[in-house]
A protein has these predicted regions:
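Bacterial Sec-pathway N-terminal export signals of envelope proteins
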Residues: 19-70, 87, 91-93, 97-100, ...
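Sec/SRP-type N-terminal targeting helices
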Residues: 42-46, 59, 93-123, 307-308, ...
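Small/polar, glycine/serine/threonine/aspartate-rich low-complexity segments that form flexible
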Residues: 67-101, 177-227, 282-290, 334-366, ...
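Short, charged, amphipathic alpha-helical segments
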Residues: 106, 235-243, 376, 442-450
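Short segments within alpha-helical structural elements
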Residues: 152, 192-193, 198-200, 250-272, ...
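Acidic, glycine-rich loop-and-beta core segments that form the ion-binding/anion-interacting portion
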Residues: 288, 293-342, 356
């Protein structure tokens, strides 16, 4: 029983470690799954496998020819009567033709392999880019929800000030926040009742008594006017924060819809159900570029697309050599075997003995136009592949420089907005504390809160852009 328990515990530990490793390195896991199951990459690999099958075809001799002949009436020969003949002939191309043909097929298979690597690298870049987009959307939802909590806190503070007429202390407003947590709409009954009661109280307090009441002091009218203005300002502040809340709630809803779309886009690269869950890391490591700039620039020719055109150029060079050698004669070697029947009365020593005749044949390639056209075709295709290689390399250099610029820009923005977000967060906390004690303008609190939200979004965008730029550099250099 103890052994069974040990095995169960061991299995659970292995499973937990497996899932933890997947959680820590989920992107690597998704890249592996994409390489295994993406139909586009599998199609390119199948094409490469099919191209490999052409190599033994190209390096093989043509099939030998077998000829059978039967004489309906035996032919009288000196050594007897010939009744049948059998001949075998094998044609051999000119020296080096098969080697050139094999080289062409091998280089074309290599080009297919480089095409497969290109598709795989492009898939990896798309998976990384889509993964980073998912991460950005998830983080933006988290940031928006945290800022929504801040706005709800500001709403409670504004509602408390509106109820107390702006005269309550911070402790008093803290107690009022608990009782007014449900007052989130300017059209709610509680707020209307409080505003109506406040207005009626102010109105009754400002009306002079007609029966023996003391006379109104000269400053009471100004005080009532300032209290009315303060009440209006507090109500406007409450409406402002509720407008911001509604805008942010709408933005969160939009981000949630975007998250569904991002998952569909990501899952299609893995060829799995589009609604499958995707797990992302809690944070993206800000990985530096792996090599220095000069080494990266020198590695651009290692891009599989460049190597593919190089292989095509070499294949067409071998094809040109093959076309040249195909214009030379083909040599045939064979054997003719004649069946001889004995003839009565023939005293020859060869009477009835079969005859064997070695044969040699030679083709005459006198129609030269087709061989010339084959050479011209191979030469033009070789030049086209060389020009395509140059064009791809030029585009890689431009795209690499653009990716490097994007990386440097994103790296600067990460440092900038990380610091700016910290400063803005401290400013928001200080302004909220100051507003609670009646020392800060509510508009300034909202403005700084919006700036904090903007900095946090930009910081996430910068981190995603930086990692996407690194993935782009890796894709361009073919690593």
């Amino acid at each position: 029983m103890r052994q069974i328990i040990k095995y169960i515990v061991l299995i659970i530990m292995v499973v937990v470690i497996h899932y933890e490793s997947n959680g820590q390195d989920s992107l690597s896991y998704y890249l592996e799954q994409a390489a295994l199951y993406n139909p586009g990459v599998k199609s390119r690999y199948i094409e490469y496998s099919a191209a490999l099958e052409k190599v033994p075809q190209a390096s093989s001799l043509t099939d030998p020819e077998l000829q059978l002949g039967y004489l309906l009436k035996p032919m009288m020969l000196l050594g007897g009567n010939q009744v049948a003949s059998v001949s075998v002939m094998q044609m051999f191309p000119w020296f080096g033709t098969l080697k050139a043909s094999k080289d062409e097929a091998s280089k074309m298979a290599l080009a297919k392999f480089e095409s497969f690597l290109t598709a795989k690298n492009e898939l990896f870049y798309n998976v990384k880019s889509s993964y980073y987009k998912l991460y950005r959307t998830i983080k933006e939802i988290e940031i928006a929800e945290k800022n929504l909590e801040i706005l709800h806190t500001l709403e409670k503070l504004a509602l408390t000030k509106f109820r107390t007429g702006g005269t309550g202390s911070s402790q008093g407003m803290g107690g009022q926040m608990q009782s007014g947590t449900n007052m989130s709409s300017p059209g709610s009954t509680g707020m209307n009742n409080s505003s109506m009661s406040g207005q009626s109280n102010m109105g009754s307090g400002s009306m002079p008594s007609s029966q023996g009441s003391p006379a109104m002091s000269p400053g009471s009218g100004a005080m009532n006017g300032s209290m009315g203005a303060t009440g209006k300002d507090d109500m406007v502040n409450l409406l402002r924060v509720q407008i911001e809340i509604h805008d942010l709630e709408n933005r969160i809803a939009l981000l949630r819809d975007q998250l569904v779309t991002d998952k569909v886009s990501f899952n299609r690269f893995l060829n799995r159900p589009l609604s499958a869950d995707v797990f992302t890391a809690d944070s993206l490591s800000q990985t530096p570029i792996p090599l220095n700039i000069h080494e990266l620039t020198d590695s651009l020719p290692n891009n599989p697309m460049v190597k593919m055109y190089q292989a095509e150029s070499e294949a067409n060079r071998a094809k040109y050599d093959m076309a040249t050698k195909m214009g030379y004669p083909m040599l045939g070697v064979g054997l003719n075997y004649m069946l001889i029947q004995k003839r009565d009365g023939n005293t020859s020593m060869m009477n009835g003995k079969d005859m064997k005749m070695p044969m040699v044949s030679l083709s005459l390639p006198i129609y030269r136009k087709k061989y010339k056209a084959m050479r011209n075709e191979a030469g033009l295709l070789r030049d086209a592949a060389s020009q395509s290689e140059i064009d791809v390399l030029n585009n890689l250099q431009v795209n690499f420089q653009q990716a490097l610029q994007n990386f440097n820009d994103a790296d600067r923005r990460v440092k900038l907005y990380t610091g700016q977000a910290l400063l803005a967060d401290k400013s928001v906390q200080l302004l909220i504390t100051s507003y609670s004690s009646g020392g800060a303008d509510f508009v300034e609190v909202l403005r700084m809160q919006q700036q904090l939200l903007d900095y946090q979004f930009k910081q996430v965008d910068a981190v995603v852009d930086k990692n996407t730029s690194i993935a782009r550099v890796v894709y361009l250099t073919g690593n």
